[in-house]
């Protein structure tokens, strides 16, 4: 069964560059090299001098900091400390450091507290020139046109795309817009064009992602989330049940799961198994799918004659991942 526990040290520390709007709102913070630490010190963020920034981030940091008149922001160098990852985030810099820890694969999903993060994240216009305050978009667009530039707004959201901050080794991402910062992608993972990975979610091994991995969902090694498939997350509707897809599982195209799957499970294409789905067992007994949550070696299928959802021993091998698609990431 997929191990979702995340051994880690108590806290974290990192130096980075933060974008500050004219009203003082922190739009983002980029931490190029976050680290876990046993004794990080008290939680908080301090601004760095130019000399400190050059020492901790490299010589290029000196040129990167300062006012950006085009976007109406200031870029500042900071050092953020989290004394304990079990404690909830205290500010925007803290949240961004935790998201970086996930995408740098230093912490697994659910391996730290993310309580209250939405309150610390501003709604930001993510553009081709960098993060911009939403109220300033048209002003920045005009500034760009005045310089012969075209401003492209890729999204207006609280979370940026991961690849603008972290590019994990050994993965393929066909459409970067569909992977949020805070996604955890293990080496060998391929995310195709229709795949999506939310924050505090992702893969723990080689996986094919052609469907949606919702917030809080973890997918085990060797599993395939088929085209258009869905996994129920822990955000919408106040859900708090963690969905774990075990190892060597197949969630077929346009299928979905609202329960945990053990290892070697298959959900046939087009079948959505929610916790309340009534499932007929091999002996004729009818149970709710939640009673099978986490069980291994099960084939979930819909009887094409009666329409009944059935659970059968998964004696057949679905073939596994195509090694050619994952061995050269």
Swiss-Prot record:
Enzyme Commission numbers on file: 2.3.1.117
Taxonomic superkingdom: Bacteria
GO molecular function per UniProt: 2,3,4,5-tetrahydropyridine-2,6-dicarboxylate N-succinyltransferase activity; magnesium ion binding
Entry annotation: catalytic residues: 210 (acyl-anhydride intermediate)
Pfam annotation, one family: THDPS_M
SUPFAM superfamilies: Trimeric LpxA-like enzymes
Chief site of localization: cytoplasm
Protein's recorded name: 2,3,4,5-tetrahydropyridine-2,6-dicarboxylate N-succinyltransferase
Organism: Streptomyces coelicolor (strain ATCC BAA-471 / A3(2) / M145)
Taxon lineage: Bacteria, Bacillati, Actinomycetota, Actinomycetes, Kitasatosporales
């Amino acid at each position: 069964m997929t191990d979702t526990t995340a051994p880690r040290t108590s806290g974290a520390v990192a130096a980075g560059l933060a974008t500050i709007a004219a009203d003082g709102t922190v739009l983002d913070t980029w931490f190029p090299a976050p680290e876990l630490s046993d004794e990080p010190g008290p939680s908080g963020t301090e601004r760095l001098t130019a000399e400190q920034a050059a020492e901790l981030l490299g010589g290029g940091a000196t040129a990167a900091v300062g006012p950006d008149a085009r976007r109406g922001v200031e870029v500042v160098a900071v050092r953020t400390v989290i004394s304990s990852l079990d404690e909830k985030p205290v500010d925007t810099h803290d949240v961004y450091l935790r998201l970086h820890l996930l995408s740098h694969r230093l912490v697994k999903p659910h391996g730290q507290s993310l309580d209250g993060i939405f309150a610390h994240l501003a709604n930001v216009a993510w553009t081709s020139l960098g993060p911009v305050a939403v109220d300033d978009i048209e002003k920045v667009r005009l500034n760009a046109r005045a310089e012969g530039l075209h401003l492209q707004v890729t999204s207006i959201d609280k979370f940026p795309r991961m690849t603008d901050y972290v590019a994990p080794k050994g993965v393929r991402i066909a459409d970067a817009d569909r992977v949020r910062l805070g996604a955890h992608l293990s080496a060998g993972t391929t995310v195709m064009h229709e795949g999506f990975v939310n924050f505090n979610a992702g893969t723990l091994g080689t996986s094919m992602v052609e469907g949606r991995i919702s917030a809080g969902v973890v997918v085990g090694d060797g599993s395939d989330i088929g085209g258009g498939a869905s996994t129920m997350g822990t955000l919408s509707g106040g859900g708090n049940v963690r969905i774990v897809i075990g190892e060597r599982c197949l969630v077929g195209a346009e299928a979905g799961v609202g329960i945990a799957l053990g290892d070697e499970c298959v959900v046939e294409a087009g079948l959505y198994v929610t916790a309340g789905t009534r499932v007929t067992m091999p002996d004729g007994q009818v149970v709710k799918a939640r009673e099978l949550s986490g069980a291994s070696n099960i084939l979930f299928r819909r009887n094409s004659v009666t329409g009944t959802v059935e659970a059968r021993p998964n004696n057949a091998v679905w073939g596994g991942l195509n090694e050619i698609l994952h061995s050269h990431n």
